[in-house]
């Protein structure tokens, strides 16, 4: 597990978060792939896969920017009831839940797995938070996470199989027929390191970037 947290150690809840940059990394076969609490993280070109509970957790607020990541949870060794992606914006101080602002941007990412719902949020004050999912391929149960009526989900591909080459063998390259190919937004490639994928291949290879960490060659 990559764990990053800064809550209550100095007696202040939700003060200026600490910075962590994760790029071109593969995280797999953990209980939780990425666990962040009141932190500041940028994550580019990462593959988080096959975790016993959560793929990525962003809790107790914080500032997070995720671009060109593949979060794919096909854990098969026991039953999993938790989603691949979870976020919340509060901490309990022993008396009540205290809101900590959550700012999260998810661009050109896959969030998928073998559960019906792979994105969940538990927000104390959603109007005080900012979050967006742009040009992402996601798996959700509308009864749990009604993305169709949440403006923060922009140009998302819902419940379309990303068609990985062989996720059972951790091969998360896209098949030729994947809906994620050329489905990203090139305007979201805002830093030079996004011009190549996790394997160092040029991005984009086609008319637009693929939605994922691995660009289809």
Predicted feature locations:
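Predominantly extracellular beta-rich ligand-binding scaffolds that present long acidic/polar faces
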Residues: 33, 42-173
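Intrinsically disordered, glycine/charged-rich C-terminal tails and inter-domain linkers
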Residues: 21, 65-66, 71, 91, ...
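C-terminal accessory segments
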Residues: 155-216
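Right-handed parallel beta-helix
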Residues: 1-49
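Short, charged low-complexity intrinsically disordered segments located at boundaries
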Residues: 15-16, 20-21, 54, 97, ...
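Glycine-rich, flexible loop segments associated with nucleotide phosphate handling
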Residues: 13-22, 98-105, 130, 195-197
């Amino acid at each position: 597990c990559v764990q990053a947290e800064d809550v209550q150690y100095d007696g202040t809840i939700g003060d200026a978060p600490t910075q962590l940059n994760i790029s071109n990394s593969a995280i797999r076969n953990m209980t939780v792939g990425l666990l962040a609490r009141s932190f500041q993280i940028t994550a580019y070109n990462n593959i988080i896969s096959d975790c016993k509970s959560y793929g990525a957790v962003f809790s107790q607020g914080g500032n997070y920017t995720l671009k060109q990541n593949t979060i794919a949870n096909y854990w098969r060794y026991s039953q999993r009831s938790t989603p691949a992606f979870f976020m919340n914006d509060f901490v309990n101080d022993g008396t009540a839940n205290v809101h900590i602002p959550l700012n999260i941007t998810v661009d050109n990412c896959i969030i998928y797995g073998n559960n019906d719902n792979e994105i969940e949020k538990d927000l104390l004050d959603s109007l005080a938070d900012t979050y967006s999912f742009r040009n992402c391929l996601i798996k959700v149960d509308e009864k749990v996470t009604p993305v169709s009526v949440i403006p923060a989900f922009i140009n998302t591909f819902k419940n379309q199989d990303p068609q990985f080459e062989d996720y059972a063998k951790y091969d998360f390259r896209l098949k030729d027929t994947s809906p994620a190919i050329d489905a990203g937004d090139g305007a979201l490639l805002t830093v030079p390191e996004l011009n190549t994928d996790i394997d160092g291949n040029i991005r984009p290879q086609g008319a637009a970037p693929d939605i994922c960490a691995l660009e289809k060659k």
